[in-house]
Amino acid sequence: MTSSVSRPSGRRADELRKVALTRHYTKHAEGSVLVEFGDTKVLCTASVAERVPEFLRERGQGWLTAEYGMLPRATHTRSDREAARGKQTGRTQEIQRLIGRALRAVFDLEALGPRTLHIDCDVIQADGGTRTASITGAFVAAHDAVSTLIAAGKLTRSPITDHVAAISVGVYEGAPVLDLDYAEDSRCDTDMNVVMTGAGGFVEVQGTAEGVPFSRAEMNALLDLAQGGIAELVQLQKDVLGASHA
């Protein structure tokens, strides 16, 4: 591995894109956030339903589930809406399950009570890292939805146990880099998505060699990069939530 690399964006190997989290982006959902990782923009909403899936009836606990989708022109060329095709792609199903798992990792579902938190992540513009941006933004939307429940007297305490955020890392031109945009993601040798809690626990690691297999040393370097990047994202979440932080 090389110690430095020339990235298309001009960023350092360990530098995130400009990240922004805009709360209360829409007025109807209990929680809504526009998350921006550079040119990737995702609208994340959290909606509360006072019911649970059939498999959780009579258990006295809640549930959190997620859906993910991309607008037809979120990418360079237009894609048909999945609804028009009559089914979701495997990629869509994989990503929305990942988002749900990531958020459930930091929720006490018993404390949530017999209700469901529906997370919707809609990609407005894609430039790499849509799933990691979705997780990072969805946490803030979920936090705001919980705050709404507390303010309404439906919860006495927050069921959120920690922060959760996600980032992509990869081996690009022989060097480990943080937060890949599309130009890097489409040409990298290794692509990895990492989900971690604020306390530093790993929720999920998805890593794939796109051509050249990666070594244990490269994997360790990628995880170190991801850990540093996620720490920055968690701090941003805390800064954005401010006094309302649970």
Curated annotation (Swiss-Prot):
Assigned keywords, A-Z: Nucleotidyltransferase, RNA-binding, rRNA processing, Transferase, tRNA processing, tRNA-binding
GO biological process terms held by the UniProt record: rRNA catabolic process; rRNA processing; tRNA processing
Annotated EC: 2.7.7.56
The keyword Chloroplast is annotated on this UniProt entry: no
Superkingdom of origin: Bacteria
GO MF annotation, one: tRNA nucleotidyltransferase activity
Catalytic activity entry: tRNA(n+1) + phosphate = tRNA(n) + a ribonucleoside 5'-diphosphate
Residues where phosphate binds: R91, G129, T130, R131
HAMAP family in the record: RNase_PH
Assembly and interaction partners: Homohexameric ring arranged as a trimer of dimers.
Family note: Belongs to the RNase PH family.
Functional description taken from the UniProt entry: Phosphorolytic 3'-5' exoribonuclease that plays an important role in tRNA 3'-end maturation. Removes nucleotide residues following the 3'-CCA terminus of tRNAs; can also add nucleotides to the ends of RNA molecules by using nucleoside diphosphates as substrates, but this may not be physiologically important. Probably plays a role in initiation of 16S rRNA degradation (leading to ribosome degradation) during starvation.
Protein name: Ribonuclease PH
